Every structure is written in C-alpha cells, then in structure tokens.
Curated annotation (Swiss-Prot):
Role noted for this protein: Vacuolar v-SNARE required for docking. Only involved in homotypic vacuole fusion. Required for Ca(2+) efflux from the vacuolar lumen, a required signal for subsequent membrane fusion events, by inhibiting vacuolar Ca(2+)-ATPase PMC1 and promoting Ca(2+) release when forming trans-SNARE assemblies during the docking step.
Main location: membrane
Molecular function (Gene Ontology), one example: SNAP receptor activity
Gene designation per UniProt: NYV1
Organism listed in the record: Saccharomyces cerevisiae (strain ATCC 204508 / S288c)
Identification of the protein by name: Vacuolar v-SNARE NYV1
Amino acid sequence: MKRFNVSYVEVIKNGETISSCFQPFQKNENYGTITSANEQITPVIFHNLIMDMVLPKVVPIKGNKVTKMSMNLIDGFDCFYSTDDHDPKTVYVCFTLVDMPKILPIRILSGLQEYESNATNELLSSHVGQILDSFHEELVEYRNQTLNSSGNGQSSNGNGQNTISDIGDATEDQIKDVIQIMNDNIDKFLERQERVSLLVDKTSQLNSSSNKFRRKAVNIKEIMWWQKVKNITLLTFTIILFVSAAFMFFYLW
C-alpha cells in the first residue's frame, strides 16, 4: 500500500531555522505524479520561500491552529504553517505535493508540538517519521477492515464472484475517494482558517495603529499644553514689564 509522505518540514524560532527535514521525491503511478520540475526542487528552495514568503505572513493564533497558504508559492505544492501554542515565536512549516492527503500536514504540524524538542534535524526527522508511521498504520487498518467486510476474501469461481485482487483494487479506489472528499472538506476549512488569520492580523494592525494614534494624540496634547503655559508665562512677564515701565515713567515724571 502507498505510504504517504511530506516533502519538507522546517522549524523556525525567532526568525532563525533550528531544524529541517527533506524527503526526496519518489515516483508512484497510483497516487499522483512527480514531474521532472518537482525532482529539481531542493531544500534550499523551500527554505528561501519560507523566509521570504511565509514568515512575513505568519499570524500567531492560539489553539494550535494550522493555516494553509492560499498563495501558490511553487507549482505542484501546498504550504501549511502553524505557530507553537506556548511560544508564538516558534513556527512550523510544511510543504506537500498537492495530491497528498491534507490531513497529513495537519497531523505533522500539530503532532510536532507535542514533542519536547525538535531542535536538531535528526530529532525532527525522527518525529516526522513517527507521525507518518502512525498515519500509515491507520490506513492499513482501514484497508484491512474494508477487505474483511467486502466478501471475506472470496476468490473467483467463475460465477461472477469478486476475486481478492478485485476487492483490493476496489478498496484502493475507495481510499482514494475518501482522501479526495477529505481534501475538499479540509481545503474549505483551511481557507476559512486563513481568512480568520488575516482578520486577526488586520485587527492587530488596527489596534496597533489605534494605540500609536492615541500616543501621538497624548504627545500633541502635552506639547500644546506646554506651549500654552509658555505663552501665558511670556504674556505675564510682558504685562509685568509693561506695568513696571509705566510705573517708573509716571514716578520719574
């Protein structure tokens, strides 16, 4: 059975990469295609895209949320990111081929945050592998349950009964259909999630602008108050000087 994988995972803290994991591409005719252009994609390309295009758009959201980038960063790939619920300055980014199950990057990005540390490439690769193994085991279990319930392993006897091979092919097709439906639903959810992220970002920007305006208004008010005090003081001294001069003039006269 096909083993699904992710293409690239990177962990960033305070704007610096602390670990990364790259999975070389493998051709498989059953689940999507790998083009020659895909095969030329390197970890450096993924890393540069993350630094230049992903991090500037990251909006920390509480609750271990995963966001899908709606912008097409690179043909044939989807990009997902999540911020650490306990440390918003830690960002997890994952690239997958577009035909991979969308639940997979969600499982990866959420699962990585449950580990105590992903501080080295070896640790990150090990943790990603464990999550992928768990996902693969679930698919195998689902396939076996479907096979057992679809004819109980009947073989062909010439009377139109399904062979084990036919049942296996039907099961594979069913898994593909389930994955496609799941992808469509998750895509809709993640699109809403990105809109929420953008709304949070805009709200944060508005709050920041409001605070800056409020501080400027207070500063201007203080400047105007001091200017008023200076004007009153100057006017007072002018009046005193004028009165003193007038008094001396009349006194000497």
